[in-house]
Amino acid sequence: MFRSFAVLVAVSLVLSGTKNASGFAYIFAGETNGLDVVSHPQGYVGTGGTLVVTLGINPSTTNASQMVVSAQNVVRTINSKAVTTGNLEFVSLSGQVDFESTLLHEVGHSLGLAHVNAATESALPSSQRNYTKATNGANNSFDLNAGADGIIGSADDIRGDDDNLNWFKTADNNPFTLASVVDSTTYSRDLADLPSGDLFSTNGDRTVANQLFSLANTEAVMQQGQFFNELQRTLTADDVAGIRYAESGLDEIAGTADDYVLELRYAGITTNADIVINDSTGGFAFSRNSGQFISGGPGHIRMINQGVFFDPGANWHFNQQSNAVPEPSAALLLLAGSSILAVRRRRTG
């Protein structure tokens, strides 16, 4: 038996002159469904193996043909689970917004990842949305103090009775590096597991990266918000950890029978896909998802009924350059084979 709930989540990106911004967080985690909820991609039922999730583009979408390359690129980026730093690139797009960067963020939501910052859903003023994602606690009011360093989202933030929703690496609370094993033995949501002296889960936004970790132009993809003339097309350790932690399955231990490997596939211009890209009838860009508790896995939810939506009237930049690694040509393979043969001849001659 599966328990369903009709929670409908609409997650929007906000554009402004300032950036609205850690460890990773999951959609549906909170006071209603449980603080420790882990969300999994559609189709996961608690058994191991390859978990295929498809991404398609609604044929009626205004810019469908222009979205194809970016959709394929996002599939490869997520499947690679490659950790990068310096993933923010500033370019001249004549005031356009990079569609591929936005799509990568929204597909992350459809796979179960939440914003890692307080974001617009907190209803906080924009200047406070970079605080790490949390509930507002028993007093029903966010407790926000940037601590001695004055940097919002850092390890010395004082958050009162706010309940942390952001999973962190227990060894060092560093959201910009990845543990060799990603599961409940290396990551936690419980503040009692923080390194000695740390008060809260560290936020992975660009200011924290630059000022506290000496990492320029680096920010988690799952932070809310995007600048004009900015590319963010690769994942950070934050983002990869969120995907891999979920892959450790219902027991949250890597290397056991319930582990899965996410494989995102591009389905084409079709609505016959698990995640479908659509035109938005209101809002710049957002994902809409519901979820279902998984039998035998308390606190584990799988995504269902997913869609990502984009304003067709927005000033989008549609990337037409593939990120696929080119296959070596037959001539190059022949040349490589000849070189190996020549080396072998010299060694035996």
Regions picked out by a protein language model, each given a short descriptive name:
Residues 15, 171, 340-343:
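General helical secondary-structure elements
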Residues 17-324:
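Zinc-dependent metalloendopeptidases
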Residues 7-16:
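Bacterial N-terminal signal peptides
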Residues 8, 94, 333-335:
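N-terminal hydrophobic alpha-helix used for membrane targeting or insertion
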Residues 326-344:
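A short, hydrophobic C-terminal helix/tail in secreted or cell-surface proteins
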Residues 1-7, 329:
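Bacterial N-terminal signal peptides that target proteins for export
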Residues 346-349:
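Short, charged juxtamembrane terminal tails flanking transmembrane helices
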